[in-house]
Amino acid sequence: MTCKIHREAIGEGRVVLRVSGRLAGDNVDMLRTLLQQENNVLTLDLKDVRLVDGEAVKLLAIHESNGVRIDNCPLYIREWIRREREGM
């Protein structure tokens, strides 16, 4: 299963990155690069994410702490992010 990231501008200065598939390995680096390049207010939509690894969770936790909104996050990922943030 691959990872797909679709960028959608939803108004002036607001962008949603819709992530689907497997967010692990090289795909985490791809998402990291996209997040670093973005100058708009960001929302990550994780509705269609099926699998993440530890690096993905760390990335999500850091960016959520820095103001990126995470929508439609599967419960197991949400819990993992919460635990990661507690350890930061």
PLM regions with names:
Residues M1-L31:
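STAS-typified acidic loop motif
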Residues V19-M88:
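Amphipathic alpha-helical interaction surfaces in cytosolic regulatory modules
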